[in-house]
Amino acid sequence: MLKLLLGDPNARKLKRYQPIVTDINILEEDIALLSDDQLRSKTADFRQQFENVVSFAKQRALLDELLPEAFAVVREAAKRVLGMRHFDVQLIGGMVLHEGQIGEMKTGEGKTLVATLPSYLNALTGRGVHVVTVNDYLARRDAEWMGQVHRFLGLSVGLIQQDMSPAERRRNYACDITYATNSELGFDYLRDNMATDLSEVVQREFQYCVIDEVDSILIDEARTPLIISGQVERPQEKYQQAADVAAALERAAEQGKDGIDPEGDYEVDEKQRSCTLTDEGFAKAEQNLRVRDLFDPADPWAHYITNALKAKELFVRDVNYIVRDGEAVIVDEFTGRVMPGRRWSDGQHQAIEAKEQLAIQPETQTLASITYQNFFLLYPRLAGMTGTAKTEEVEFEKTYKLETSVIPTNQPRARADWVDQVYKTESAKWRAVANETAEIHKQGRPVLVGTTSVEKSELLSSLLSEQEIPHNLLNAKPENVEREAEIVAQAGRAGAVTIATNMAGRGTDIILGGNSDYMARLKLREVLLPRLVRPEEGHRPPVPLQRAAETGGGFAAKAAASNGSHGHVLSEARAIGSLYPCSLTDDTDQFLAELARELVKVWGDRALSVIELEDRISTAAEKAPTDDAQIAALRESIARVKTEYDVVVTQEEVRVREAGGLHVIGTERHESRRVDNQLRGRAGRQGDLGSTRFFLSLEDNLLRIFGGERVASLMNAFRVEEDMPIESGMLTRSLEGAQKKVETYYYDIRKQVFEYDEVMNNQRRAVYAERRRVLEGRGLKKQVIGYGERTMDDIVEAYVNPDLPPEEWDLGQLVSKVQQFVYLLEDLKPEQLQGLSMEELKSFLQEQLRNAYDIKEGQIEQQRPGLMREAERFFILQQIDTLWREHLQAMDALRESVGLRGYGQKDPLIEYKNEGYDMFLEMMANMRRNVIYSMFMFQPAASGQEQA
């Protein structure tokens, strides 16, 4: 009703952009008249305007002002370089992204092209722009493909890949626009904040970020934090000795009261899940271990004994854990399921292994961690695009403060979504899928089948092989992943059948009739690879499924036979056949052979790596100007091959359209409606014809867990045959309800992860900011003296009670504590402090500390000028890193323990916040004290070598 009265809010929002679109369209004519050089010089003109604008707010205002002209420039560059012109709706998409929102754009509407607009505009500030994708392949593809537009306009384009060295990373992050995956960005951020020298830092300050497939990164991946951990070298035999000591100690029958120890060696508090040694227990343990002090820092035992006691009393075999195959496996207390691979932290798991006489595995310790939620919130402006965001609108708004706008499609949608078919058993469902695939394949239409697991995709593959239907398999198996792009590029050809597991198939569009541009590049690769690439790489070049030219289009049936019963890897024999739509003319074959000979002369005989060859072919496939004669020759040959292929591909495209376009089959409902919509969105791109259908069975997970019995009893009542499908509105509605339930459940988990990490995040930012200041070496001396002054204040506050008269203050104790930290003040006498007020005491001691520090600096600088600054930096970083690591563990332990406080009517999150804050203040105070102590104790070796 409200919608009728007020109109669609999304439409109202988009209306705002219309006048700007008109401005860009008016500018288009003038900009089209510019030469390439004049168009390129626009970038320098824009950049000049930012020279004296420093503040973020002013830069943003200037960007908004430049937007119409900058967008018009990018549109013209894309026309010249890629032969693609941004539609009006894509300009609106660009504006939505520039404003830091999420744009929902349907599959095939050119999301990747849209991203060029805001990334060019925001790169003009010189602060750098990050474009984030879900995997390395897509990052590389986009950097090569869309990067052409930016390079043509004079911007530098960087790419981050998994195996890059720090120097390469730094160079790529320094570019105007950098393409990377979410995990590479996150891990680089964590590594930068563990660097011990500024030269190791690879990233710049964050400015603007566009995330492709934003739902996948900010929602699906949000539950798992990024963690860098290191193995901790701890003596294994200590665990065993501690377990033996714990076994010999006796538990107290009751807990001590009013500070008086009970009878026995240790007491157990089951509520707090803790064990504490009594004085008697300490003596016994020290005697058994033949040590003088369990807390001796040189040989600490207390931690091991406490863990051994907890393993003995609080961790019960077959309740908290089971022993299986020589390992202690945790049992989840909520579900009762075992959790292989999971381990208790902080040495507790090792204590249990010692108790059970199992092999003790090394401890790991978290060195740094962050969630994607908090990582991406570090960007002052964040934007994202996806085909499906509306179902998660609330979460984007609440967690990330991101609005969602639905961008209209350029052409009206012509896809038909057929009704779901539900079968009684899974085997009946798979037979039905194979039959429908065969039926549609015979009509000459391409079919894409989405499966949920590798196992299921191979089951369907064998069913299709029985019917002799040639098909392509695309799942997480390594041999198939390599060919992902090639397979998807061919999935739109007449009669093509592609089985894809849901991990796959993002990023490459399915073009009806096939992608002639891609086939031409593949042909070139096939011709050049044996001549130019080093054979010892052991890299079997992926070559897509072949077709026989004489069939004039449809896949050759012989392909099925060699696919084997499970459609695994293509046989080597067929791998160099002809996947291509037609054979090339003799002239072109001759031309390619000649090209290969020429390239061998210049680039060497089999001297390149596969990646280098691919990069050169990709560069040749661009339209950007080049002075390189070899790249120009490659470009000419790609164009020549493409022209020949186009003749067949265009005819095939017409045939496929007439037959009804791509048909997409879903074989199971996913936990999230969003993933189902992504699969459907593969058909009917850009107004193409197409159809989709989901096949389900009562044995599918979602139906089984949420209300399958009710439906099963209905089917039994109606005596439905196994092979008879049900099409029912009630069923579809209850499925959607089930999906909503699952989505809400996962949202709550993510929300909780976020709320707890939010507490850590504020602490993380403070620690990392302090660390960065030290790395950059800004005012180190002032910082250390500041630490010292605060330490003096802490000592005064600890030893002086303002409520007592000054003559009762224990100044002797206070002075000896100060001398512990600053041995240079050994002449300080308690008498010098008499008669001073508390504030005067603080000022006097701070003054003494500053003088002592100057003396220390004089001594150290005599050894080698600059050594004092190096020492300051070393000690601060060492202390921050050590204490932060310990703090991370303590916060983990706190998080586990606060959960129980819900029983005491306390909010665990508030308890976590308050205690976490106190622990953080304590950590920072320890860091200051340790640094001051280390600086005064620092004695460089005579050679001038630093001894840490």
Curated annotation (Swiss-Prot):
Membrane topology listed for this record: Peripheral membrane protein
Main location: membrane
SUPFAM superfamilies reported in the protein's UniProt record: Helical scaffold and wing domains of SecA, P-loop containing nucleoside triphosphate hydrolases, Pre-protein crosslinking domain of SecA
Catalysed reaction equations from the record: ATP + H2O + cellular proteinSide 1 = ADP + phosphate + cellular proteinSide 2
CDD domains named in the record: DEXDc_SecA, SF2_C_secA
Annotated keywords: ATP-binding, Cell inner membrane, Cell membrane, Cytoplasm, Membrane, Nucleotide-binding, Protein transport, Thylakoid, Translocase, Translocation, Transport
Pfam families: P-loop_SecA, SecA_DEAD, SecA_PP_bind, SecA_SW
Enzyme's top EC category: translocase
Gene Ontology molecular functions: ATP binding; protein-exporting ATPase activity
Subcellular location as annotated: Cell inner membrane; Cellular thylakoid membrane; Cytoplasm
Record flagged with keyword Lyase: no
UniProt-listed Enzyme Commission number(s): 7.4.2.8
Known partners and oligomeric status: Monomer and homodimer. Part of the essential Sec protein translocation apparatus which comprises SecA, SecYEG and auxiliary proteins SecDF. Other proteins may also be involved.
Family: Belongs to the SecA family.
Protein name in UniProt: Protein translocase subunit SecA
Name of the gene encoding the protein in the UniProt record: secA
